[in-house]
Amino acid sequence: MKKLKTKVRSPGSATIINAISTGCGSAFGIQLYVKAEVQLKQGTEIECTSDQKVDSTLMEICAKNILNKLKINTGVKIHIQSNLPVASGLSSSSAVSNAVTMALTYALTDEYQINPKEVGLDDDGILNMAVDSSLEAGVTITGAYDDASASYYGGISITNNLKREIIRNENWNGQNILIYMPDKKSPTAEADVARMKLLAPWVKLAFHEVLKGNIHHALTLNGLLYCSALRFNPDIALDALEAGAVAAGLSGTGPSFVALTDDKNLSKVEDVWNSYPGRVILTKVDNQGTQVIASE
């Protein structure tokens, strides 16, 4: 056994359209990352560690599913590093699933000289395995195919989550992205699905906007709708818009809010959000997606 370390970096994503109410969604990659380091070892133990409170169950399920897919029995050591906040509405679970699934796929197919495409583990196959693992771990309601595909491929992803179909994926050079992080967590699996389903007719309107390319309108309308359903304070988004943001709203099922702003109004929006308890993060769109960064 070569005992190589395979390292993969996977970005989080922010919401344009939350898919929970209708099954169709949209998200874009952001430059906050999960890094997974995978090393094969003797035995059959799956050993998982992280520098954040990442769910080890999700990591173990990702590993187990790839090992079963390839019909390989071996020990695996997985370590996660991350500057992507967990349970925050920024697709941390999708990023972990993508990073671990890709890293272990590459490590195993290299060690055992397997062609990934011949066993159904091309990019689409890896992404689907990652989504399956997230569903099995119970960290997502719909599989979050919109979030997962934005994290995997980068840029903006528009999807039908129920069909696991990418309607459109493209690079996006958007404005500055500000993320407001309150001092609390909000796991997606604990969100009130029934209340979100009530939003379906209006979320469909927002989804049509994103299909037409009206990203700012779609993000804001979606974000305000889900604020209402999930009882988050819409003033957080409205204050950002009043300060000059071109779009603002809740990301995922919260508690994070995302705002898009040009350079001129960046400091104004940042100042407004800094008046709330919590922290504000400045980032950009990630157009690269999930990728191997080292194999050593």
Question: Can you describe what each PLM-predicted range is?
Answer:
Residues 1-88, 272, 285-296:
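ATP-binding N-lobe of GHMP and related small-molecule kinases
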Residues 64-65, 101-110, 157, 208, ...:
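Short glycine/serine- and small hydrophobic-enriched flexible loop segments
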Residues 211-296:
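Glycine-rich, charge-dense phosphate/pyrophosphate-binding loop(s)
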